[in-house]
């Protein structure tokens, strides 16, 4: 109450920030007449002048008013678009490293040019991040005209580009690309063997378009580069026969033995999207597997040798019970293609991990592709936090403002609209059944159609969009369907969605990033005519002119009919997705309206709010076909959505806390890789490793400070001869000297090892041997890091069970992950020293052959894939608690095939705390390796 009172007096933080930025806008506007007088060459010359001033020490903040004024004027001349004052505020918000929430149609693409131009002047690169290749290419070409006019270079970073094209794209002042591609390039850069094979520069400044989609919706799904692992095709086929033999149990058994309405073999947790075998289910599964010869008679699924079978059983169960065709995936050309749960788009090439995709392929009887082994991975949360400055834009960020601030340290600023919004958001209507709801939707669509008002109908799945399409056909209402299956026609459908009497059905936010213009998008329609080679040139000109002539009439006709009407056929789990759907109407002060039609059979209501709403309907004795339209019900639904949002936030936060452990270790490994790549000679590092390893070997047989009776010299001699190629008569040495001690024996062995090493170097030359050492070091580090990632995944899967032993799973995970990491670094030292000491060479050519053989034995895996995949079963484990276990199946991920790397990792000072979490100084912990 006090806060509200103070806000009335002083205004909210958002209002104060906007007011502060408006003062800067006034300064920019005052410069406008002066900038307008400049010739094109003088305007272009301003870029060089700004760069000189930056080199002389002037800050970007001080340059901002003049740079923004120059960018606005250049845009007016080149693009025929002048930035509005509110767009200038948006540009400032981006420059100061915040998130700008701007309504649909307010020109976010143009806003990005202000911050991108100003920050590109420093010469350290700017990344503009979009959600798909189409938008990256469109924006780079469209806004590239403005940047090129001002003397800046623009690059496009697309999947499948050649290595030199990528290097050129990143070397440009401003680089457009997708979030996936930027992340994969970072991982690839940290897998290279030569410094000039990298493509990225240090990560400086990023402007993330649709920031909510990238930093929140996709935050739970890491980017993974993987290679093919062992083939289990036959096992997936056999396991696919199991789920149809099992029956679902209805109801959960309570402590007193009640609660089960119908006994069965497995239970479904719809809220957490999990499946669990019951006791009878385990027994039946074990019996069936024994019949098929997969386990021994009387053996348990939980026996150590059957743990992998358990994984396959659950993968098959999840595929049959939680993942449905035309909702979570489609089958096209003999492949299972994932449907993005947030946009409704198809994602060809992407795959679910943890065996789930193979289980779905077995279910659909298509070719089963091999499982993968992780080579490198990172989450978007940890990738984007590496930028020196991060900012973003979206139409809907305010509901997630807390998460942006908590996870990324980004403040959200709501930018005022250029014109007052005129959209009318009507109360939700709730029906008892889905049939009644669809009847009401058809009635509403018919009314709009008859008065010439365009309608956009939002659905939550392909299945629902096709059901509604079928109902509209029966009702005789012409319409277009915009879902993943019509991806190729998407732009054409969206371009005409604002014309009178147009009815468009869209899954989630298909078509996001493209405005629906009342009366139709003339530019888009004209572009389609221009691209059609079958139409003669004079006919093209006539048709385009006709389009422009018609548009004014159509635009006024649609405005009079009420503008674009949005119909939501279901509430999403997140209020933000609902707001995105509503936001398609009422752009730039146009009229518009929206309404959601719900039924008690919808998952959100059934799981979270159904009982309360059903009780209200029963109390009111609602007849069939009648709807509730009341604020109390809408608030009840929003409360349910808030619960889901809070739960999803907890999931993402928990996952981040677990991923931070591997992220800290990743920083150490990648920093050491970079140091190895950049070092001309690593003899000193190899020498320190050799001395450490030899010391450990000697101390096993001759402990420090021990007496002669405790020494095992024959065993030491044999170990040095067999494992380290050192033929030393240590027993003779001891017999000849009565006063020799343990330290002197160590010195003698170390000296012999150094001489053995120097003899190899002398044979082939320092330069050749140094290149060999670097190659061995990198290959060994990469191979053991891959194995370490697999070990971390394995650890994560079972760590939540520590909670039953009254231990904190998170602390246990950190402790064991640190122990695994320390063991991995020790293994690197042992392995590299062993190879260098044992390699037999007489010439530089033999040295190259040896390096190639070692690479073949333990080097890269073939068929590398780039995945945006889920933690799946690991997710439940990863969180060590109900929150993340609930969300295991929600972390549906995606996997992408691309070809061919990254920002430098922030340096860790020698005296700084080691990022692995041990509490030691870096030089005494993982800095020892470097």
UniProtKB/Swiss-Prot annotation:
Could you say which EC number(s) this protein's record lists? 7.4.2.8
Keywords associated with the record: ATP-binding, Cell inner membrane, Cell membrane, Cytoplasm, Membrane, Metal-binding, Nucleotide-binding, Protein transport, Translocase, Translocation, Transport, Zinc
User: Which family does the entry's similarity section mention?
Assistant: Belongs to the SecA family.
Q: Where does Zn(2+) bind?
A: 914, 916, 925-926
Question: Which residues are involved in binding ATP?
Answer: 87, 105-109, 515
Q: What is its main location?
A: membrane
Q: How is the cofactor bound?
A: May bind 1 zinc ion per subunit.
Q: Which gene encodes it?
A: secA
The protein's matches in NCBIfam families, at most eight in alphabetical order, are given as: PRK12904.1 (NF009538), secA (TIGR00963)
Role of this protein: Part of the Sec protein translocase complex. Interacts with the SecYEG preprotein conducting channel. Has a central role in coupling the hydrolysis of ATP to the transfer of proteins into and across the cell membrane, serving both as a receptor for the preprotein-SecB complex and as an ATP-driven molecular motor driving the stepwise translocation of polypeptide chains across the membrane.
Q: Which GO terms describe its cellular component?
A: cell envelope Sec protein transport complex; cytosol; plasma membrane
Determine if NADP is one of this entry's keywords.
no
Q: Which organism is it from?
A: Burkholderia thailandensis (strain ATCC 700388 / DSM 13276 / CCUG 48851 / CIP 106301 / E264)
What do we know about how this protein assembles, alone or with others?
A: Monomer and homodimer. Part of the essential Sec protein translocation apparatus which comprises SecA, SecYEG and auxiliary proteins SecDF-YajC and YidC.
HAMAP family xrefs: SecA (MF_01382)
Q: How is this protein named in the record?
A: Protein translocase subunit SecA
Q: Does the keyword Protein transport apply?
A: yes
UniProt cross-references to InterPro entries, sorted A to Z: Helicase_ATP-bd, Helicase_C-like, P-loop_NTPase, SEC_C_motif, SecA, SecA_CS, SecA_DEAD, SecA_motor_DEAD
| One GO BP | protein targeting
Give the main EC class.
Answer: translocase
Q: Which cofactor does it need?
A: Zn(2+)
What reaction gets catalysed by this protein? ATP + H2O + cellular proteinSide 1 = ADP + phosphate + cellular proteinSide 2
Q: Where in the cell is it found?
A: Cell inner membrane; Cytoplasm
